């Protein structure tokens, strides 16, 4: 039975209440810890899951316990995951990276905004009630300077961002001493180079080689540094954004916070409705994770939704607007070339990418080459001045498994490889977007093609969905493909929610999509053999075998759902210490029986050992003391 549908007014009121009452919140039996680095201000947040001790013997009156180590885990929630930090959405988050940016001395504050659209929005007092109050004074690179993490990496500079990432990627596993927890199966990495310990130098080296990116616009100092690359943990992106028919600024900020709570490593704001500029400002000032956008969406709004009326000038103005707000990466559909559009004519589902279809329509209506391709070097110059990473969009991705791996898809991919090399000339960081809808047996080719033709730049895919028959469950159909392509080397997975193909996701849909994709990403890390990836699994298995129910809930990706499902049948507190669950009951619990078998085997070993000693004693004549030569 579905919950009662809220009205638009009720949805906005609920979101406003969420924002007004927002506090830093820890997961059950978890606490926020910080690991400090060697460079000033490097203080890396993690979540530490506290575990209960294991009963190892003794009596009912005097039981003996063995402590279980706390499990440190990667935490994307930023200040929202720390109960000690006061949260005020009206003021935004603390500017963590500002001292690092200022110390480099290669940026300058802008007295006047570069975007005409931004100037007009700021001058219009009718937007005062919607506007974020504490507007950041934007910066850009000084003349002749480049301020990208790729530029620094190529210069041999280890930035504070790189040290922060190295500590974060190691996930505090050096704190774990138990051999049981540290045990890990060998992985199959398909050529990925996974160091036993991630250092700041290894981060720098991967970024310098173009195999990884650090999305970190100088105008988004609130963000906590993270990295996207196949030699690091697989990351997950969540999409949010309003549309012309639904959602509000309050709801999008709520979805942002909610996304970071459930593990979004980055968030894309795909707003297409009114107040795109104002919504994005609220999101950026309150986001501890990198924010991506598809600038063509807003550029289209500026020409009243008529693709044919798009111009390079309007698009350039949009890039400047968003770069100075702090957007960390742009999806640019520069690979949709005029000559590729006819290749899609025989497809079952044509061009399904919104950005791809916009550019295809523009190309056909003007019979000119894609202006994003034509002006790509100018795009790179803008990105280099603010350290905006490029996510080269797959505008010709397949929208059905019938269209997977076709001529149009791979023609565009090869062009994205050419554009990657151009971006690198400007020290601009690049990742490549991928499909889409691909059956399982055809997924790996997408990864091998990308590595070969895009020079090992990080791959970022939407799924892929492995079947087309499950609307309402496409987080499952795509999670299968996401786990596979993550294993093969994909660096970041864009989540798919249950609402895919059906409607705009709400808060619960966002959670469901993220949990599904955190599972897929983690499964890929395990399969690749990422160092330390198995620690949490081992801790869960140990807690499960020892019937430490509270620890099982708390180690779960979603502790609340795990507890709810358990309590549906065993709600009493006694159920939290019972050596069985409702699936098998007390008589048929396999783990309880296994424990009994283990105890019996141990007892048998003792009895056999005693019998052997007795026989040996008799064989030696039954003497308590033996002569020295007999001993």
Swiss-Prot record:
Catalysed conversion reaction: 5-amino-1-(5-phospho-beta-D-ribosyl)imidazole + S-adenosyl-L-methionine = 4-amino-2-methyl-5-(phosphooxymethyl)pyrimidine + CO + 5'-deoxyadenosine + formate + L-methionine + 3 H(+)
Cofactor notes: Binds 1 [4Fe-4S] cluster per subunit. The cluster is coordinated with 3 cysteines and an exchangeable S-adenosyl-L-methionine.
Binding-site residues, substrate: 239, 268, 297, 333, 353-355, 394-397, 433, 460
Amino-acid positions noted as binding [4Fe-4S] cluster in the UniProt annotation, renumbered to this chain: 581, 584, 589
Record pathway: Cofactor biosynthesis; thiamine diphosphate biosynthesis
A GO BP annotation: thiamine biosynthetic process
UniProt cross-references to NCBIfam families, sorted A to Z: PRK09284.1, PRK13352.1, thiC
HAMAP family given in the database record: ThiC (MF_00089)
Assembly and binders: Homodimer.
Family designation: Belongs to the ThiC family.
UniProt name for this protein: Phosphomethylpyrimidine synthase
Native source organism of the sequence: Shigella dysenteriae serotype 1 (strain Sd197)
Lineage: Bacteria, Pseudomonadati, Pseudomonadota, Gammaproteobacteria, Enterobacterales
């Amino acid at each position: 039975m579905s919950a009662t549908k809220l009205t638009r007014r009720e949805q906005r009121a609920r979101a406003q209440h969420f924002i007004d009452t927002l506090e830093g919140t820890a997961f059950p039996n978890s606490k926020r810890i910080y690991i400090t680095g060697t460079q000033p201000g490097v203080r890396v947040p993690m979540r530490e899951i506290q575990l209960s001790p294991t009963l190892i013997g003794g009596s009912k009156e005097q039981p003996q316990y063995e402590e279980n180590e706390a499990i440190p885990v990667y935490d994307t929630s930023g200040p929202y995951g720390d109960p000690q930090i006061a949260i005020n959405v009206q003021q935004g988050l603390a500017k963590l990276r500002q001292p690092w940016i200022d110390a480099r001395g290669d940026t300058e504050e802008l007295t006047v905004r570069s975007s005409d659209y931004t100037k007009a929005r700021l001058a219009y007092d009718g937007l005062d009630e919607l506007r974020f109050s504490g507007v950041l004074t934007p910066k850009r690179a000084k003349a002749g300077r480049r301020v990208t993490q790729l530029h620094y990496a190529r210069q041999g500079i280890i930035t504070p961002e790189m040290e922060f990432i190295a500590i974060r990627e190691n996930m505090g596993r050096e704190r774990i001493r138990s051999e049981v927890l540290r045990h890990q199966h060998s992985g199959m990495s398909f050529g990925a180079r996974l160091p036993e310990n991630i250092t700041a130098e290894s981060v720098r080296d991967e970024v310098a080689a173009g195999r990884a990116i650090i999305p970190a616009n100088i105008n988004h100092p609130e963000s906590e540094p993270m990295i996207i690359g196949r030699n690091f943990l697989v990351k997950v992106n969540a999409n949010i954004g309003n549309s012309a028919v639904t959602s509000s600024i309050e709801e999008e900020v709520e979805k942002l916070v909610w996304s970071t709570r459930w593990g979004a490593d980055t968030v894309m704001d795909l707003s297409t409705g009114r107040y795109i500029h104002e919504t994005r400002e609220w999101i950026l000032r309150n986001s501890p994770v990198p924010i991506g956008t598809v600038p063509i969406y807003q550029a289209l709004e500026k020409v009243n939704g008529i693709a044919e009326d798009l111009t390079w000038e309007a698009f350039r103005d949009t890039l400047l607007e968003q770069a100075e707000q702090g957007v960390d990466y742009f999806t640019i559909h520069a690979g949709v070339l005029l000559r590729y559009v006819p290749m899609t004519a025989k497809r079952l589902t044509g061009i399904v990418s919104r950005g791809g279809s916009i550019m295809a329509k523009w190309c056909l209506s003007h019979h000119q080459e894609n202006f994003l391709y034509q002006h790509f070097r100018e795009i790179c110059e803008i990105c280099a001045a603010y350290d905006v990473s490029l996510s080269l969009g797959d505008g010709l991705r397949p929208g059905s498994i019938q269209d997977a791996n076709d001529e149009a898809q791979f023609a565009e991919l090869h062009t994205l490889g050419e554009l990657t090399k151009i971006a690198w000339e400007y020290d601009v960081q690049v990742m490549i977007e991928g499909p889409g809808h691909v059956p399982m047996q055809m997924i790996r080719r997408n990864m091998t093609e990308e590595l070969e033709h895009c020079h090992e730049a990080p791959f970022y895919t939407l799924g892929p969905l492995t079947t087309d028959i499950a609307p309402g469950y496409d987080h499952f159909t795509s999670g299968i493909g996401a786990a596979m392509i993550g294993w093969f080397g994909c660096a970041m997975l864009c989540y798919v929610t249950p609402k895919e193909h059906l409607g705009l996701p709400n808060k619960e849909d966002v959670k469901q999509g993220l949990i599904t994709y955190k599972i897929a990403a983690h499964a890929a890390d395990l399969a690749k053999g990422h160092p330390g990836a198995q620690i949490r699994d081992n801790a869960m298995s140990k807690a499960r075998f020892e019937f430490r129910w509270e620890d099982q809930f708390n180690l779960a990706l979603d502790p609340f759902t795990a507890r709810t499902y358990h309590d549906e049948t065993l709600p009493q507190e006694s159920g939290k210490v019972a050596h069985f669950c409702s699936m098998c009951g007390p008589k048929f619990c396999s783990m309880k029986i296994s424990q009994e078998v283990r105890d019996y085997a141990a007892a048998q070993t003792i009895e056999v050992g005693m019998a052997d000693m007795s026989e040996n004693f008799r064989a030696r004549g039954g003497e308590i003391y033996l002569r020295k030569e007999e001993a």
